[in-house]
Amino acid sequence: MENVFDYEDIQLIPAKCIVDSRSECDTSVTLGGHTFKLPVVPANMQTIIDENIAAWLAENGYFYIMHRFEPEKRLAFVQDMKARGLISSISVGVKENDYEFIRELKAQELVPDYITIDIAHGHSNAVISMIQFIKEHVPESFVIAGNVGTPEAVRELERAGADATKVGIGPGKVCITKIKTGFGTGGWQLAALRWCAKAASKPIIADGGIRTHGDIAKSIRFGASMVMIGSLFAGHEESPGQTIEIDGKLYKEYFGSASEFQKGEKKNVEGKKMHVEHKGSLQDTLVEMEQDLQSSISYAGGNTLEAIRNVDYVIVKNSIFNGDRF
């Protein structure tokens, strides 16, 4: 690999502005035949999304992916979203009960709009088999497969039938894969995204390592169609985690999908738990993200997300905050 860098190492270079107001800039993105207000999706984690948040996001024009940690509820969830005329977007693993679930979907002629195959190391025979199984049983579903961190993985999952791939091995705030295993894209996630996107012929979803709204624009610049975000979406009024008070301040729980809090056991743990400050309403965060991304588009010299893909950039190792940590 040539240059290795991460989000805080990159600054995008402005181009001549062509809009009178940032409100003229369109942040929408199309994925799998549906158009969404933002190229952003809350992480499919138990402390980030639940049925209520999924329905609210769908009703308001945002993409979502429901988590896979209550498998017994998945069928009813798809039925409910269909009944309400909303997009259905669910996650599966690669275990026998996941295969059973896909068979059940076919038997009931239920076709989720999106199915995300979601395991920590997605470049695997198990994921390839599941992609092929889904495409055989519910071929109309848009299949997102991951997570991966190499061009070879992207090509192989696309060849197997994936409609999009999710890039990121352990760069998230509550993920400790890099510490526990020595592997992953933590610390060079943005370079890994660029590397993978160059090999991709289908959409890429960047997953993990996003710490600021500017990182969304950087992900778009380096090839992401959609950006999955955990920690920035944790801690909202609507978030599923428990609210607790520490020294007079309100916090919410946020834990990784491979943490012992998620698994209920200390076995193959690659995630941790943290408390994030209570952030108010999810809608306020989404509006702020949209406004910041509109500003990014205006700096990129265009009026759609496409403009961001064409800007120049510089690598400024670890210096863009100049001591200012938000």
Swiss-Prot record:
<dbReference type="InterPro" id="IPR013785">
    <property type="entry name" value="Aldolase_TIM"/>
</dbReference>
<dbReference type="InterPro" id="IPR001093">
    <property type="entry name" value="IMP_DH_GMPRt"/>
</dbReference>
<dbReference type="GO" id="GO:0003920">
    <property type="term" value="F:GMP reductase activity"/>
</dbReference>
<comment type="similarity">
    <text>Belongs to the IMPDH/GMPR family. GuaC type 2 subfamily.</text>
</comment>
<dbReference type="InterPro" id="IPR005994">
    <property type="entry name" value="GuaC_type_2"/>
</dbReference>
<dbReference type="InterPro" id="IPR050139">
    <property type="entry name" value="GMP_reductase"/>
</dbReference>
<dbReference type="Pfam" id="PF00478">
    <property type="entry name" value="IMPDH"/>
</dbReference>
<comment type="function">
    <text>Catalyzes the irreversible NADPH-dependent deamination of GMP to IMP. It functions in the conversion of nucleobase, nucleoside and nucleotide derivatives of G to A nucleotides, and in maintaining the intracellular balance of A and G nucleotides.</text>
</comment>
<protein>
    <recommendedName>
        <fullName>GMP reductase</fullName>
        <ecNumber>1.7.1.7</ecNumber>
    </recommendedName>
</protein>
<feature type="active site" description="Thioimidate intermediate">
    <location>
        <position position="175"/>
    </location>
</feature>
<dbReference type="GO" id="GO:1902560">
    <property type="term" value="C:GMP reductase complex"/>
</dbReference>
<feature type="binding site">
    <location>
        <begin position="204"/>
        <end position="227"/>
    </location>
    <ligand>
        <name>NADP(+)</name>
    </ligand>
</feature>
<dbReference type="GO" id="GO:0005829">
    <property type="term" value="C:cytosol"/>
</dbReference>
<keyword id="KW-0521">NADP</keyword>
<keyword id="KW-0560">Oxidoreductase</keyword>
<dbReference type="InterPro" id="IPR015875">
    <property type="entry name" value="IMP_DH/GMP_Rdtase_CS"/>
</dbReference>
<dbReference type="GO" id="GO:0006163">
    <property type="term" value="P:purine nucleotide metabolic process"/>
</dbReference>
